[in-house]
Swiss-Prot record:
This is 2-phosphoxylose phosphatase 1. Its EC number is 3.1.3.-. It is a single-pass type II membrane protein. The keyword Phosphoprotein does not apply. The keyword Transmembrane helix applies. It comes from Mus musculus (Mouse). It is found in: Golgi apparatus membrane.
Length: 480
């Protein structure tokens, strides 16, 4: 009996130790050898702190975590919120592609070992990931505008290629699509069950990461969609300016903005010292290190919780990362103050905002086509739009950022239409320059469509110099 009791005690103790070991591994408190699907077999130092509530002062690590946009708990969003007597008419969505592999490599360092195949059992997980892969395999004959028709429909390289969408990026947009589906289809019935291809407008730049992000969002929004009803148009310009891309004044603003960035960097002695330290570690000239845009690669290490690269002379570290990230935050602050980027944004964003307003006006008049519009784009697409709208407090577009324009009809006064603007789920309508003081002057709960129309058709040019009344004249005027 004594031996039996001792055996049971030892068995319970062994079970407790096993549980503690698994718990410690889960919380990254002891090293764990990763499988092929998890990355390198080496022990990896944990570099990513747990997200916390927003700190009282600007924290570069917290800002970087927001930028990573790691899929976690369900997101609280304000899309689709309106008084009960308003009817949703159309929705226009701009997205930045999801998490990607770096566009730049730090010379003389090992590339981060990130697996760009999609594995349903690997984190980050999504219940529809396996079904998404199966559906993409059925789309080999999809008819997209060239060159989109030659791009892969989902990422599939064991070692990611330059700029390739990762599994994290796919999951980010599956979640975006699922969120929009719950709000716009299940709640507001934006599209009928037998929706047609004419009711969608889909556009992507020619990068695989934007097409694949668009497809992931679309699958979350319309699971098992009919491939014959889906057509992505190709947009050659990251500004989505279509046939209105030639704009000399916009280019002048951009050149002066780039000059401002350069001068700010020269003034930052901490940044130059940090670049010098990093260059010494990897044994290259400081100028070469700076040209390699090391923050791009370091953000990939950070977002994927992989140790920063090392050489025989040492390792790049969190302090280097913090200095560069802090400079980025300071650059964004000064950018809004100097207004050069604002001038660039007004001209850069006008063509796509004009297209959006025209679609809204057609929908308001009863046109039933293009009720859901999706532009799959880049940070350099969303950032000018945010700036042009006057959203100066908006953070730089994170991975899988979304900007949504909603058009609503007042059922009590069917001729009246209103708009809502949402950025990453937050209602920013009354922070825009065209509606920031409307609620002070009117008891109406929504911003009139006319305000947005007037802003795009007139006020954007007034904000530039006041003398131009159309896009062509503004682009060929003087003012930068």
């Amino acid at each position: 009996m004594l031996h039996r009791n001792r055996f049971l005690v030892l068995l319970a103790l062994a079970g407790l130790l096993a549980f503690l070991s698994l718990s410690l591994q889960f919380f990254h408190l002891i090293p764990v050898s990763a499988t092929k699907n998890g990355g390198s077999s080496k022990s990896r130092k944990r570099i990513m702190p747990d997200p916390v509530t927003e700190p009282p002062t600007v924290d570069p690590v917290y800002e970087a975590l927001l930028y990573c946009n790691i899929p976690s708990v369900a997101e609280h969003s304000m899309e689709g919120h309106a008084p009960h007597h308003y009817k949703l008419v159309s929705v226009h969505v701009f997205i930045r592609h999801g998490d990607r592999y770096p566009l730049y490599a730090i010379p003389k360092t090992k590339r981060p070992e990130i697996d760009c195949t999609l594995v349903a059992s690997r984190k980050p997980y999504h219940p529809k990931l396996e079904a998404f892969i199966s559906h993409m395999l059925k789309g080999s004959g999809a008819s997209f505008e060239s060159p989109l028709n030659s791009l892969p429909l989902y990422p599939n390289h064991p070692l990611c290629e330059t700029g390739e969408l990762t599994q994290t990026g796919v999951v980010q947009h599956l979640l975006n699509g699922q969120l929009l589906r719950d709000i716009y289809l299940r709640k507001h019935k934006l599209l009928p069950n037998n929706w047609s291809s004419d009711q969608l407008y889909l556009e992507s730049t020619g990068k695989s990461r934007t097409l694949q992000s668009g497809l992931a969002l679309l699958y979350g929004f319309l699971p098992e969609f009919d491939w014959k009803k889906v057509y992505f148009k190709h947009q050659p310009s990251a500004l989505f300016c279509s046939g209105s891309c030639y704009c000399p004044l916009r280019n002048q603003y951009l050149e002066k903005e780039q000059r401002r960035q350069y001068l700010l960097r020269l003034k930052n002695s901490d940044l130059e010292r940090t670049y010098g330290e990093m260059a010494k570690i990897v044994d290259i000239p400081t100028k070469q290190l700076r040209a390699a845009n090391p923050i791009d690669s370091m953000l990939c290490h950070f977002c994927h919780n992989v140790s920063f690269p090392c050489s025989r002379s040492g390792c790049l570290g969190m302090e280097h990362f913090k200095v560069i990230k802090t400079h980025q935050i300071e650059d964004e602050r000064e950018r809004h103050e100097k207004l050069l980027y604002f001038g660039y944004s007004l001209l850069g964003a006008h063509p796509i905002l004009n297209q959006t307003v025209n679609r809204m006006q057609r929908a308001a008049s009863g046109w039933r086509d293009e009720l859901f519009t999706l532009y799959s784009a880049h940070d350099v697409t969303l950032s000018p739009i945010l700036s042009a709208l006057g959203l100066l407090e908006a953070r730089f577009p994170r991975f899988a950022a979304r900007l949504v324009f909603e058009l609503w009809q007042d059922r009590q006064k069917p001729s009246e239409h209103s708009v809502r603007i949402l950025y990453n789920g937050a209602d920013v309508t009354f922070h825009t320059s065209f509606c920031h003081d409307f609620h002070k002057r009117s008891p109406k709960p929504m911003c009139p469509l006319e305000n947005l129309v007037r802003f795009v058709k007139r006020d954007m040019f007034v904000a530039l110099d006041g003398s131009s009344t159309n896009y062509y004249d503004a682009c060929h005027g003087e003012g930068a």
